[in-house]
Amino acid sequence: MEPSLLMWRFFVFIVVPGCVTEACHDDPPSLRNAMFKVLRYEVGTMINCDCKAGFRRVSAVMRCVGDSSHSAWNNRCFCNSTSPAKNPVKPVTPGSEEQRERKPTDAQSQTQPPEQADLPGHCEEPPPWEHEREPLKRVYHFTLGQTVHYQCAQGFRALHTGPAESTCTMIHGEMRWTRPRLKCISEGANSQAPDEAEPPESTEAPPGSGTFLTTRMAGTTDFQKPTDVVATLDTFIFTTEYQIAVAGCILLLSSILLLSCLTWQRRWKKNRRTI
């Protein structure tokens, strides 16, 4: 087989999938006196398999995989003790459980979230695995199309001016979270006047905001203080970097096609001379 064809196959199966990955690179918006829930996870969502001190994760991440007819977490998170005297723990099969709050620093809301449904193409919250580092501080890598639902914390009530949810979507060529139209005020406070303009909420989580998708860089595509150095399935998709990666993929594809054409033309001319 020609070297150019080998390079082409390597490009298609290795390089291209990494270039087209669609991941949300920002945290969901942070609202004052409110918290958000994730009722269902889109296919492609990843969760870091983090372990307590003294334990080492076997798998780096757990990924939601499937299609419109069936979806499930394709991996098991479990932790092995770093001490040879201890036996490895038994893995926990991912499954559904009651949804937890993403911000334990905020009190539990008195408003019940929308009822969770088992829909194809989505994964539910997996249960904690044994020796998990902090079940309430899991690091998620959301994908395009993910929606989170907001509700006011206990002691606050909502002034709805629109949908109390945020969705990761493509806006002007960039993946961004839509702004939830929710304002939470104290239960004893007077309602806001209808004509009073509500200040826009930031779509970026400020430092110490309580969202547990903290990263080394701004975004949800990095890991939260890993306890061991493991090659992971990070999706390094940021606005500028994503465009550069796509341009690089196109350039590499063009170069390989050109090399293939030149090789085929050279072989064709050589065969004609021999005839």
Curated annotation (Swiss-Prot):
Regions of compositional bias (Basic and acidic residues) in chain numbering: 121-130
SMART domains named among the record's database cross-references: CCP (SM00032)
Cytoplasmic face residues: 263-275
Domain named Sushi: residues: 22-81, 121-186
MF terms in GO: interleukin-2 binding; interleukin-2 receptor activity
Disulfide-bond pairs as recorded: C24-C64, C49-C77, C51-C79, C123-C168, C152-C184
Signal peptide start-end: 1-21
Topological region Extracellular: 22-243
Annotated localization: Membrane
PROSITE patterns given in the database record: SUSHI
Subunit structure: Non-covalent dimer of an alpha and a beta subunit. IL2R exists in 3 different forms: a high affinity dimer, an intermediate affinity monomer (beta subunit), and a low affinity monomer (alpha subunit). The high and intermediate affinity forms also associate with a gamma subunit.
Designated name of the protein: Interleukin-2 receptor subunit alpha
